[in-house]
């Protein structure tokens, strides 16, 4: 295919109609380099201002040289380029999260409203097949979306209808690690798909067809259920169990970054059926609120309320307090991080001691006053000790003692960790 053919496809689809500035995620591979060539050549026709963003993962000897070459490429094209270096323990998931966090920073800094990636049809096949093997919920088998709105930005994948073989051979960098089968996606690409294509030469087309069919069903159900108020439980429960599940799943599609597992979805169903009033965080900064025959799922407002020497910390929030950084459900990195098992079900209270405080230790209730005396804790330290409380019980006296019979929950929605780092040394 010729470059003008790709331009015509972009114009026909109207990918950039609503955008004046676009950030291109530039890895240096063939697909992203060719997308760079098309977008930079036809900026005027597409009416966009192009900005480049690259993440140096620091995993290969060639990484730094490739970064320098991309800087030269950007300078020759007279385009701005932003580069960030990945650090820490490498994993596919951590690297992906790092990239998208960085891309959003670049967009915020530049005022861009579109993020463009070079995902193509081969990536789509691999993604759908990976999710199928992992047992992902049906709606996620529709694969990567061509256009996806996340908050105030739109992710655009204009190559999703093309295969890698459609791209001309131009200057690019080869990542030799793609040939190694250490990572799951590489095993899919290098081993599983080629073997299955021996059984069915059109296996890739079959996978893409399934993904498109699931997407059609998903969109049709959303359209047909548009006038059903799923948040009205009386209305929801008037349908069969099967229809309830489909309607609830369609409702959850409104929250693309929620991503409940099958077990978590089943628990939400159970809560809606069994609890008259309920409120608790569920996942990724969302909470479920139920009041009799109504419910809603919404984002938890980031906040930490401080009243009368007491701080209330909500799930998936962080706060610095009296020389410590407290992180509720968000891991901290470092050698001296304390970890306390807690629950997502309710907020954590951090305070100083009160008269009558009791800690459960080894199955016995012990007054803090007596505990401090037994441990020979100085008066000054007693008064400054931070008490961590949840469900009305003391979970821990920071640096002194922990309730080893703190509430234990049975499901993966409710279990989490409070991470604590001393920041005032």
Swiss-Prot record:
- Binding residues annotated for ATP, in chain numbering: 27-32
Q: Which InterPro entries match?
A: Lysidine-tRNA-synth_C (IPR012796), Rossmann-like_a/b/a_fold (IPR014729), TilS/TtcA_N (IPR011063), tRNA_Ile_lys_synt (IPR012094), tRNA_Ile_lys_synt_N (IPR012795)
Localization recorded for this chain is:
Cytoplasm
Q: Name one Pfam family in it.
A: TilS_C
UniProt enzyme class: ligase
What CDD domains has UniProt attached to this entry?
TilS_N
Q: GO annotations under biological process?
A: tRNA modification
Molecular function terms in GO for this entry? Answer: ATP binding; tRNA(Ile)-lysidine synthase activity
Q: Which SUPFAM superfamilies match?
A: Adenine nucleotide alpha hydrolases-like, PheT/TilS domain
Q: Give the comment on domains.
A: The N-terminal region contains the highly conserved SGGXDS motif, predicted to be a P-loop motif involved in ATP binding.
Similarity-based family? Belongs to the tRNA(Ile)-lysidine synthase family.
On whether Mitochondrion is a keyword of this UniProt record, the answer is no
**GO cellular-component terms in the record?**
cytoplasm
For this protein's source organism, the top of the classification is: Bacteria, Bacillati, Bacillota, Bacilli, Lactobacillales
Supply the name of the protein. Answer: tRNA(Ile)-lysidine synthase
What the protein does comes down to: Ligates lysine onto the cytidine present at position 34 of the AUA codon-specific tRNA(Ile) that contains the anticodon CAU, in an ATP-dependent manner. Cytidine is converted to lysidine, thus changing the amino acid specificity of the tRNA from methionine to isoleucine.
This enzyme catalyses:
cytidine(34) in tRNA(Ile2) + L-lysine + ATP = lysidine(34) in tRNA(Ile2) + AMP + diphosphate + H(+)
The organism named in the record is Streptococcus pneumoniae serotype 4 (strain ATCC BAA-334 / TIGR4)
**In its keyword annotation, does this UniProt entry include ATP-binding?**
yes
Q: What is its EC number?
A: 6.3.4.19
Keywords, ordered alphabetically: ATP-binding, Cytoplasm, Ligase, Nucleotide-binding, tRNA processing
According to the lineage, what is the superkingdom? Bacteria
